Design a protein with these regions (language model features):
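Expand to "…catalyze enediolate/carbanion chemistry for C-C bond making/breaking, isomerization
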Residues: 206-207, 219-227
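A short hydrophobic/small-residue beta-strand
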Residues: 51, 212-213, 219
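Conserved alpha/beta-domain cores
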Residues: 1-200, 208
C-alpha cells in the first residue's frame, strides 16, 4: 500500500508541476512518519523514499538509533529547548521559531561539530494553535542571527496553513511566506527552501512555490497511535 501511495502521490506532484511550469525535481517530498513504526518506514525506503519527517524529538531519536543515516531526517514539529539534543540528530530542523531556540541549536551543533541545516517557522495564519515567528522585525532578528551563527545553515522558511476548507486563506498563507522569502533574499540572504504543504493542501503549496512538502497520511494512511 505504501509503495502504491507513493507512486500515486509522485504522479500527482508531477502533474501539478507540469500545470504550473515547475520542475518536479525542485521539490523534496518528505514522508511524515510520526506514529508509524520502522517497518512502515522500511517499506517506503524500498519504494525509493529517502526523506522522512518526525514531529517528536524522542521519536526521531529512537528511529535514528535503528535506521541511522540510511535516510535523510527532517525534524518538523514544535521543538522545546530541552529536546534540542535529540533534534540535532536530524539533517534538517524546520521549526526554529525563536531566537533562544536558534541559540540552543547552535550550542548543541557546535558541541557536535556539525553544521545544522535549519528553517525558520513563520506564523502565517490567525490560528492560536499554530507556532511560528510573528512580525517582520522578529523574523529579521532571528534570520540575521542564524545567518551569522557558525554552526547553523539557514536554508529557508516554513509555515503551516490554517486548517480550513477556504482555499483562499490557505493560498494566502503560502503566498505570504513566499513573499517574505523573496523580501529576505532581496536583502542579501540566500534562502532557497519553502517548507509548506501537507496532505490536504500540497497542491496549492506547489502552485505557490513550495520546495519541501511534508506529507503523512497520503503515504502511510491514517495514523495509528502506538509506541515503537
Amino acid at each position: 500500500m505504501i509503495a502504491e501511495n507513493l507512486q500515486i502521490l509522485r504522479n500527482r506532484i508531477d502533474q501539478i508541476c507540469t500545470k504550473v511550469n515547475r520542475d518536479p525535481n525542485s521539490i523534496k517530498l518528505i514522508a511524515v512518519s510520526k506514529n508509524f513504526g520502522v517497518d512502515e518506514i522500511k517499506q517506503a525506503i524500498q519504494a525509493g523514499q529517502i526523506e522522512f519527517g518526525e514531529n517528536k524529538a524522542q521519536e526521531l531519536n529512537s528511529k535514528f538509533d535503528v535506521l541511522g543515516n540510511q535516510v535523510t531526517w527532517h525534524f518538523i514539529g514544535h521543538l522545546q529547548k530541552n529536546k534540542v539534543k535529540y533534534a540535532v540528530r536530524a539533517d534538517y530542523i524546520h521549526s526554529v521559531d525563536s531566537l533562544s531556540l536558534a541559540e540552543e541549536i547552535q550550542r548543541h551543533a557546535e558541541k557536535l561539530g556539525k553544521i545544522q541545516k535549519i528553517l525558520v517557522q513563520v506564523k502565517t495564519s490567525e490560528e492560536e494553535s499554530k507556532s511560528g515567528v510573528i512580525g517582520k522585525e522578529e523574523l529579521i532578528k532571528i534570520v540575521t542571527y542564524c545567518s551569522n551563527a557558525s554552526n547553523l545553515n539557514l536554508i529557508g522558511l516554513m509555515t503551516i496553513a490554517p486548517f480550513t476548507e477556504e482555499q483562499n486563506l490557505i493560498r494566502k498563507s503560502f503566498s505570504d511566506l513566499r513573499k517574505l522569502n523573496e523580501e529576505l533574499n532581496s536583502k542579501g540572504h540566500i534562502l532557497k527552501e519553502l517548507s509548506m504543504g501537507m496532505t490536504s493542501d500540497y497542491e496549492i503549496a506547489i502552485e505557490e512555490g513550495a520546495t519541501m512538502l511534508r506529507i503523512g497520511s497520503a503515504i502511510f494512511g491514517e495514523r495509528i497511535y502506538h509506541k515503537e
